[in-house]
């Protein structure tokens, strides 16, 4: 039995015949041709074997229509959004010399050149005439929803929702893409070819668009402005992402939490939060990440690379958001203002954590003991008590830390370094947080006020401990005697009554104490002036 070719089952019309058909007849024709193509594809016919171009070249028939109908139509045949082009076929031939027009076999449309025809066939059949042979054929499992799109790129991106597949596999890393252009662009990332180099920081890029966006991080240029609120951005992607805040809508929506996204890549990265997938692994330490940008930022902790430098003080940073946040120290900008107490913050994350001091929200819970926390750093710090491990470990005393900044501060307790000096009294501190709390002793600032009794406090821990007086809460319970305490510091002091631990030793006389306050009181007895309080009564 001879094999069936497309020419054997094709039904064609002249331009005049096509014009006489009513919409329902045209729709019927399209449906029949669509089904024919799919049937041929399902039995393994390769489009390049059909010589479609030659078939139409020698027919001598007129093209069906002098206008290009929009490619993506609704199933009932109605057009959404108008027509692709108003040019007649002969005008297209004149405008593009050397390009022969090939007739489309599906919708009676005109495609410019064989490559356009191939793309057109692929859009309707799900089969790639040329490139499929190289990358391997994949079955078409689409259920068409007939949603219209203004661009081929948008259509192909949408199509993935139905198929769940992409057409091109990278042989290096296995990543898949839905267009040849995108896989070619991706392959460059493996070659290491980066011809566009930044004159300011030396960073190199594979594409001019990425290079131009990066340059704006140095110049501060933000050409893309939100029409709703006027906020400006360095690239079009950022403004689209921002617009979701106003519209509350995006083409991709998370099925788990309902969060909308403007791009497929952002959506896929977000999904990994729920699945726990972390495909990007650090070669240095083995730590895994959900997306490649996070991995690149992490790698800088190993390389020490800090490409972003402050023009005011010269301090360098590993990534751009840290620089932008630091710059606000110089400008004094604090764009995030608390509606409850009026306190302002430099960063959105610090502001969100602060808001929880008013709401009492503690969304992060320890899986080991059930204790809840208002922020992730607090929970991670707590988790070390259970695991006894952390990515950063002190070489002097072996204490583990969950993040780099507390580790750096701790190191100063051994080196004696105190880089933060009070302008009022000259007292020095190991961290910026400590000096801010200390400065309140000079300014009298007490930002934390109790709603029950109106008493105000200089810093959060004192305020939290005070609140427990009203609630009666005593979360720290001694396992030995059952006595409960409001604060962890009081609890630790109590534990020493059972263990006998006395960590504070007097160098003068060798006497030891269980708490710092008792030790400091004792040290006054060795002072040159003697104890500050002396009994004036003479013994009888």
Curated annotation (Swiss-Prot):
**Taxonomy, superkingdom:** Eukaryota
Q: Which InterPro entries match?
A: KRAB, KRAB_dom_sf, Znf_C2H2_sf, Znf_C2H2_type
Tissue expression: Seems ubiquitous. Seen in the heart, brain, placenta, lung, liver, skeletal muscle, kidney and pancreas.
What are the recorded Gene Ontology BP terms? negative regulation of transcription by RNA polymerase II; regulation of transcription by RNA polymerase II
Write one Pfam family the protein is assigned to. zf-C2H2_4
Give residue numbers for the modification (Phosphoserine).
191
Protein family membership: Belongs to the krueppel C2H2-type zinc-finger protein family.
Q: What does this protein do?
A: May be involved in transcriptional regulation as a weak repressor when alone, or a potent one when fused with a heterologous protein containing a KRAB B-domain.
Q: What is this protein called?
A: Zinc finger protein 136
Q: What is the lineage of its organism?
A: Eukaryota, Metazoa, Chordata, Craniata, Vertebrata
């Amino acid at each position: 039995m001879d094999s069936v070719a497309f020419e054997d089952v094709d039904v064609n019309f002249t331009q005049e015949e096509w014009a006489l058909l009513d919409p329902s007849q045209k729709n019927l024709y399209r449906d029949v041709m669509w089904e024919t193509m799919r049937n041929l594809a399902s039995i393994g016919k390769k489009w390049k074997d059909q010589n479609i171009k030659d078939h139409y070249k020698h027919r001598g028939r007129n093209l069906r229509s002098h206008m290009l109908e929009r490619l993506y139509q609704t199933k009932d045949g109605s057009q959404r959004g108008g027509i692709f082009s108003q040019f007649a076929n002969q005008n297209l031939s004149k405008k593009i010399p050397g390009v022969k027009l090939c007739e489309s076999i599906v919708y009676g449309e005109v495609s410019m050149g064989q490559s356009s025809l191939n793309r057109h066939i692929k859009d309707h059949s799900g089969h790639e005439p040329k490139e499929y042979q190289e990358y391997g054929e994949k079955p078409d499992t689409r259920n068409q929803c007939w949603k219209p799109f203004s661009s081929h790129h948008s259509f192909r991106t949408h199509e993935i929702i139905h198929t769940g597949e992409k057409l091109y596999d990278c042989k290096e890393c296995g990543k898949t893409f839905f267009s040849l252009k995108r896989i070619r662009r991706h392959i460059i990332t493996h070659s290491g070819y980066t011809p566009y180099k930044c004159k300011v920081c030396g960073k190199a890029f594979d594409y001019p668009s990425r290079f131009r966006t990066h340059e704006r991080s140095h110049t501060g240029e933000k050409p893309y402005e939100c029409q709703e609120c006027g906020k400006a951005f360095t690239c079009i992607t950022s403004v689209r992402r921002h617009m979701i805040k106003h519209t509350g809508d995006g083409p991709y929506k998370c099925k788990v939490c309902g969060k909308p996204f403007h791009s497929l890549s952002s959506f896929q990265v977000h999904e990994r939060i729920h699945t726990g997938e972390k495909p990007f692994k650090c070669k240095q330490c083995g730590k895994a990440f959900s997306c490649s940008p996070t991995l690149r930022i992490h790698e800088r902790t190993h390389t020490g690379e800090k490409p972003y430098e402050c023009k005011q003080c010269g301090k360098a940073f590993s990534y751009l958001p840290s620089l932008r946040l630091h710059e606000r120290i110089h400008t004094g900008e604090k764009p995030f203002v608390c509606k409850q107490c009026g306190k302002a913050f430099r960063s959105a994350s610090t502001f969100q954590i602060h808001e929880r001091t008013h709401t009492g929200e503690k969304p992060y819970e320890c899986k080991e003991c059930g204790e809840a926390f208002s922020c992730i750093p607090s929970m991670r710090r707590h988790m070390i008590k259970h695991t006894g491990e952390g990515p950063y470990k002190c070489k002097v005393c072996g204490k583990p830390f969950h993040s780099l900044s507390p580790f750096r501060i701790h190191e100063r307790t051994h080196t004696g370094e105190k880089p933060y000096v009070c302008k009022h009294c000259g007292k020095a501190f190991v961290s910026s947080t400590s000096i801010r709390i200390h400065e309140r002793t000079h300014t009298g600032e007490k930002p934390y006020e109790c709603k029950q009794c109106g008493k105000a406090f200089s810093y959060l821990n004192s305020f939290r401990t005070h609140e427990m007086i009203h609630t009666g809460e005593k979360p720290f319970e001694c396992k030995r005697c059952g006595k409960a305490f409001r604060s962890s510091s009081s609890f630790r002091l109590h534990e020493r009554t059972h263990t006998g631990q006395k960590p504070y030793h007097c160098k003068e006389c060798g006497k030891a104490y269980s708490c710092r306050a008792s030790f400091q009181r004792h040290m006054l007895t060795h002072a040159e002036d003697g104890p500050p309080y002396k009994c004036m009564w003479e013994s009888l």
